Amino acid sequence: MLSGEIFRADWDSRETSWDFARPPYLRGGHSLLQDAFDDWYRRSCETAEEAQRLETENNRYWADVYGLADKVEVDVPLSRVSLTYNPRFAFAPTKGASERAEEEYRWLHFQRSARELISWAIGVTMGRYSVDVPGLVLADQASSLDDFRARVAESRLQPDDDGIIPVTGGAFDDDASRRVKAVLRVVFGVSDLGDNIEFLTRCLAVKSGSTTAEFVPPVIPADPEQALEDYMAKSFAADHQKDYSGRPVYWSLESPKGTFRALIYLHRYTPDTVGQVLTKYAAPFVDRLKAESEAVGRERDAVMGGDR
């Protein structure tokens, strides 16, 4: 593969590329997410090394042409091969910091892949993507489910009916964490769903080492389901905004104190969307919280009354 082709393929592996087809770690038909991420990390490293070889050869050729072979550095460090998915470029230590261990590069690569997988899963839920066809599906203003069905005749996973995904810790059937699990179930299968959720949330828990502390691999969260819900509630919107350079396609609507959240899709937004968020999700959620609070109050009163 030529250097230009390598860099083009690297760019198109990003969801923000117009030519993005599907996540690169979905190749190979793996049923375990860890195997898929391992394979993607290996391919990313091999691609970076090939690009390094080609760039070094190019430098050497031009140095020879201009008689500068003894005067300029022709070897290209792997950390300067500017591929998005080159771990040693993407996660290069800051100036003056010690070199990262191979295991740290690997886990940082896994963490980014986990965040990207969740973003893609939300896209599948919204109809932006499909598990059955590559590339963008619904990406025009006021796109509808009819538009989706025209593009994807037989879909293993239908988009959300209203393009609104509540982020409430499982209070609704179409809650964000449940939707992510539904995509994992379809893509990787039912039998390994538990293992895949454990590994996914383990990747999300990666904490990079510092100049004063060695890297410690993440452990499986005590409650992987809760860890996924926490990520969706606390981190997903910020990660998405960063990945899309401040121009997100999934908008987060939140109550003043952040108790209620919902995601809506830019290209499925209609004049009725905000009203639907309020009537179908926010109001029932508030009623549920109120009922739970009243139930706790009654239990407390019963306990206190029994102690008299």
Describe the predicted segments one by one.
Residues 17, 50, 59-63, 67, ...:
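Terminal accessory regions of large proteins
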